[in-house]
């Protein structure tokens, strides 16, 4: 089954388009997980326990796992999320060529261990850099299209000789690369007008829409324009997983209050987004 079919099933089951970003910043982990063998894995496990009823997907960011214990934590996290029947989108933003790209793409192969169901990629090096990902037809490939960070406009707004902006060209290319029906686009929620414009350019490609949580993006626009035939994801990372930091300032040796707050935050975002579905 293709990734977007699996995602559609999960969206229907959870009645949710919420992607929960699993970015376990070591400096912000609660005391209740610090004595564990793998603190990041212990943290993610408890976040998943608290949020899985409201999650359409989990999105671990590879930068928080790129050390030996981190990769172990990531493998455990992927396996545990799958045990809850929630797909995993690895936010790695890979972009390289040849053997390096093929090596990066192995994170999508189940014979290499717990495999991510989808991945984010950087299209700057062109199609051949993405081909090892695209050819895995059952895995999702989310191409960076229009990002929500302020500096994104430095390159993405550049006007080409054709008259289109660079990000618009990337969007068109992503559509061309979608021969296996496994391509999505990363499109930030901080500019609703651009989100609408990009949806008009590619009516059938699901979006991963970051920026609705801590970055203050537009939830209504994220849902209205981010979904293709009801399929798409709206991500919140820090706004969910660290929602309990205030609760943790009180005596909470077990961490129960911290993780309960994460669950409540995921539920609230689901309800907020569902108003516009």
Curated annotation (Swiss-Prot):
It comes from Haloarcula marismortui (strain ATCC 43049 / DSM 3752 / JCM 8966 / VKM B-1809). The keyword Lyase applies. GO terms for biological process: 'de novo' pyrimidine nucleobase biosynthetic process; 'de novo' UMP biosynthetic process. This is Orotidine 5'-phosphate decarboxylase. InterPro entries: Aldolase_TIM, OMPdecase_AS, OMPdecase_type-2, OMPdeCOase_dom, RibuloseP-bd_barrel. It is an enzyme of class 4 (lyase). The gene is pyrF. Its EC number is 4.1.1.23. Keywords: Decarboxylase, Lyase, Pyrimidine biosynthesis.
């Amino acid at each position: 089954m293709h990734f977007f079919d699996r995602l559609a099933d999960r969206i229907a089951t959870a009645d949710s388009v919420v992607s929960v970003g699993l970015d376990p910043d070591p400096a912000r982990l609660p005391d209740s997980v610090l004595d564990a063998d793998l603190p990041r894995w212990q943290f993610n496990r408890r976040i998943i326990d608290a949020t899985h009823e409201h999650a359409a997907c989990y999105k671990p960011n590879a930068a928080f796992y790129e050390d030996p214990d981190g990769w172990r934590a990531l493998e455990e996290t992927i396996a545990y999320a799958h045990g809850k029947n929630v797909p995993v989108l690895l936010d790695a933003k890979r972009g390289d060529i040849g053997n390096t790209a093929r090596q990066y793409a192995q994170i999508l192969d189940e014979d290499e261990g717990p495999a991510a169901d989808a991945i984010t990629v950087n299209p700057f090096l062109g199609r051949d850099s993405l081909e090892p990902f695209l050819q895995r037809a059952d895995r999702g490939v989310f191409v960076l299209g229009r990002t929500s960070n302020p500096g994104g406009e430095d390159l993405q707004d550049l006007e080409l000789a054709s008259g289109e902006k660079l990000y618009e060209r990337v969007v068109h290319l992503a559509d061309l690369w979608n021969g296996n029906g496994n391509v999505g686009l990363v499109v930030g929620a901080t500019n609703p007008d651009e989100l609408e414009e990009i949806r008009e350019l590619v009516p059938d490609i699901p979006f991963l829409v970051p920026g609705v949580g801590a970055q203050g993006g537009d939830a209504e626009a994220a849902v209205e324009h981010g979904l293709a035939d009801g399929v798409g994801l709206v991500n919140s990372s820090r706004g969910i997983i660290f929602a309990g930091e205030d609760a943790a300032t009180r005596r909470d040796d077990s961490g129960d209050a911290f993780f309960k707050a994460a669950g409540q935050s995921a539920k609230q975002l689901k309800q907020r987004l569902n108003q516009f579905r």
